[in-house]
């Protein structure tokens, strides 16, 4: 029996690159979008279902990297109106949202839709998403099925700032394998 000595030498090193402004900007984009993605991960998992071998997180990052801008002072910002919380082949649902009251209440108004073979079924589940951008918190709201018209009211959580809330919607098939693209819903206020 032979006794051999295995010696492994590891060199611990930091990053030794000399980053160009483009590299620094890309790192800021990834850091900013990654921080948001971790906060809204349950929405991403539902909205990027069935993306294949990649993860829902990677699909979200890939779809939304263009929504992050970095200025010359290396300050990053996200265009929340263009943000995609879901991506897929289904047709987007027809939903409108209004905000009313002193304790803010969001009313989602759905229009009944017809079935389209392969792209929209009457039993597709429609979801609304309330996103508070300052706190980076989200609330997933289950609305009615695609074939049903109606309204769903959701009160705004007390600690949320109503001026910083963005609203989105998307549809998910009954088996939750196919989704639609998400749609940013402009808010109309009523007195």
Region roles according to the model:
Residues 1-94:
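Long, polar/Ser/Thr-enriched low-complexity segments
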Residues 52-191:
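Charged linear interaction tracts used for macromolecular binding and regulation
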């Amino acid at each position: 029996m032979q006794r051999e000595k295995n010696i492994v030498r590891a060199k611990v090193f930091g990053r030794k690159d000399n980053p160009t402004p483009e590299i620094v900007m890309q790192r800021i984009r990834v850091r900013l979008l990654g921080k948001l993605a971790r906060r809204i991960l349950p929405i991403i998992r539902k909205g990027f279902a069935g993306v294949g071998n990649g993860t829902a997180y990677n699909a979200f990052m890939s779809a939304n990297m263009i929504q992050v801008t970095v200025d010359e002072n290396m300050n990053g910002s996200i265009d929340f109106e263009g943000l995609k919380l879901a991506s897929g082949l289904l047709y987007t649902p027809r939903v409108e949202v209004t905000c009313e009251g002193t304790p803010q209440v969001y009313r989602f108004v759905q229009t009944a839709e017809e079935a389209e073979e392969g792209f929209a079924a009457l039993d597709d589940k429609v979801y609304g998403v309330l996103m508070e951008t300052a706190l980076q918190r989200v609330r997933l709201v289950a609305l009615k099925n695609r074939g049903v018209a109606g309204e769903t009211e959701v009160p705004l959580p007390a600690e949320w700032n109503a001026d910083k809330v963005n609203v989105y919607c998307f549809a998910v098939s009954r088996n939750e394998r196919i989704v639609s693209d998400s749609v940013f819903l402009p808010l109309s206020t009523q007195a």
